[in-house]
């Protein structure tokens, strides 16, 4: 229950946070806010539909759009170097722990 709360109950907020950050990055790179937002929303919709409909593991889908020495692998390397994967795991663990606290009346 607590794990499900951490993953899906709070999941939309994590997604919105990532969209917000990617929109800000697009603005930093010179795109107008509306265009940056629309590009990331469309990319997210496409990725979600592909993930749902393909039945493929996310790693396989990511690898399919990652060219050797290309832009995507450069970005993925930066995400890994900055600990984004570990931060997401730690965030979900914190949400799970907080869910447990709230369930026991320690909130």
Question: Where on the chain are the PLM-derived regions?
Answer:
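Hydrophobic alpha-helical context, especially transmembrane and signal-peptide helices
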Residues: 2-4, 34, 82, 86
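Conserved Rossmann-fold dehydrogenase catalytic segment
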Residues: 1-13, 32, 57-58, 76, ...
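Short, surface-exposed linear patches
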Residues: 28-30, 88-89
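Active-site-proximal catalytic alpha-helix in oxidoreductases
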Residues: 1-27, 38-52, 70
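All-alpha amphipathic helical-bundle segments outside canonical DNA-binding/catalytic cores
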Residues: 32-38
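NAD(P)-dependent Rossmann-like dehydrogenase/reductase catalytic/cofactor-binding core
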Residues: 41-107
């Amino acid at each position: 229950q607590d794990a499900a709360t951490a993953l899906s109950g709070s999941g939309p907020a994590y997604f919105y946070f990532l969209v917000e950050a990617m929109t800000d990055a697009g603005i930093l790179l010179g795109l107008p806010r509306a265009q940056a937002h629309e590009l990331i929303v469309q990319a997210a919709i496409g990725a979600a539909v592909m993930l749902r409909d393909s039945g493929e593991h996310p790693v396989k889908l990511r690898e399919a759009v990652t060219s050797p020495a290309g832009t995507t692998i450069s970005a993925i390397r930066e995400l890994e170097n900055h600990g984004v994967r570990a931060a997401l795991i730690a965030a979900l663990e914190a949400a799970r722990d907080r869910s447990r606290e709230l369930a026991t009346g320690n909130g």
